[in-house]
Regions:
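Phosphodiester-processing cores and adjacent nucleic acid-binding clamps
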Residues: 1-166
Length: 166
């Protein structure tokens, strides 16, 4: 399967156009194997902070999981791992072979690394006017063209904020 990333996603902050919450969108994108996603709400950036913070939180949790699984993998490989029946998180390990435990660790390490690599792309679907702001023309100017603008880096993000705020 080829990599695919949505570069034009509306959230609940796009009135009449989007209804999905940011956590559900991010979770679904990660579950579907996407390496990133761009939030481009209509004429606003109200969901950008929530989007960025949620991805940051997901990555933080994945980093903790990665460390846990890497430590467990090292113990299994060295022959020092013995599942403790008293620990809830180790009950499923009882009776599994070393190869099964190694495969499980490697699978979970790969999953955690994938989440850590997820890229939040910040953007906006802007409205492009037919005329200058001083030369408005009633109905014609109420229907405009749309332009998807994505921030490439922090400077681009700040420029995007300036554009949306005008």
């Amino acid at each position: 399967m080829q990599d695919f990333v949505h570069l034009h996603v509306h959230t609940q902050y796009s009135v009449l156009d989007g209804q999905s919450s940011i956590p559900r969108l991010v979770d679904k994108a990660i579950k579907n194997g996407m390496r990133g996603m761009a939030v481009t709400d209509h004429g606003n950036m109200m969901g950008i902070k929530e989007f960025y913070n949620y991805v940051k939180k997901k990555k933080s949790g994945a980093k903790d999981e990665l460390k846990k699984w890497e430590d467990k993998l090292a113990l299994i490989e060295s022959g020092q791992y013995q599942p403790d029946p008293a620990r809830k998180d180790q009950k499923d390990d009882i009776g599994k072979s070393k190869e099964e435990l190694l495969a499980l660790c490697r699978k979970n390490i790969e999953s955690a690394r994938f989440v850590i690599s997820f890229k939040p792309i910040l953007g906006c679907e802007m409205y492009v006017a037919h005329h200058k702001m001083t030369d408005r023309n009633g109905k014609e100017d109420q229907s405009g063209w749309h332009l998807i603008v994505l921030a490439k880096n922090e400077k681009g993000y700040h420029n995007l904020i300036k554009l949306v705020s005008r």
